[in-house]
Amino acid sequence: PIRCTVNPSVLEGDVYKKKHVNKNCNVVVIGGGTAGLEAACTAAEVGCNTFLLEKGNELGGLASLISKIPAKNRLADFPHYLMHRAEQLDNLYIFKNTEGTPENIRKFHPNIIVSSTGSAPLLPPIAGLKDRIDNENHNIYSILGMISHINDFPKDLEGKKVVVVGGGAVGLDVVEFFADRNADIS
């Protein structure tokens, strides 16, 4: 069967948009990453008054952050598409720099609350790691810390050693980034 990571209902297209809610419904979506944007757009498209709360000042979540890695810049296309889709919806209200606290959520009298708050990288159980990671006094980075300092890394790291813990997709992206800079990677 045909499948798509971006559009799980690829075979059905926009069929869901033909079904509208038949009563007033307020939806609060917490988190403005790709999952939160998709949830908010979908709720608004079926007629719900939708309020998206994003604690940061940018939408797109991890996809937008990871797109800062040069080899991953096309990842920004999907959040940009979702943001454009959201802009077209008159019943979707986006609040940046607004945390999904109980007090903030109650203001919108929600019938439905969607939590799309993302996740944090899982750290290996290495003594002292939590105190040192993403700390200015150390050169140990999580993927989020690495991306936030991506422009600080020299273009040429020849002779410098880099250790990457984790061989999943994110780890391989990091390896590729430092390999392009001639680092000695373990």
Residue ranges and their predicted role:
Residues A86-I94, I133-N139, A183:
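A short helix-to-beta-strand connector/capping loop
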Residues A63-P110:
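N-terminal Rossmann-like dinucleotide/flavin-binding domain of flavoprotein oxidoreductases
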Residues G56:
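Residues in the short beta-alpha loop(s) of Rossmann-like NAD(P)-binding domains
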Residues G13-V15, L59-A63, L123-P124:
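Short acidic/His/Gly/Ser-rich catalytic and metal-binding motifs that mark active-site loops
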Residues P1-K23:
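Cysteine-cluster motifs in flexible loop/terminal segments that predominantly coordinate metals
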Residues V21-L52, F95-H109, T117-I126, I143-S186:
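Rossmann-like dinucleotide/flavin-binding elements
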Residues K17-K19, N24, L65-D77, I147-P154:
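Short, contiguous acidic/charged loop-to-helix segments that flank catalytic cores in large enzymes
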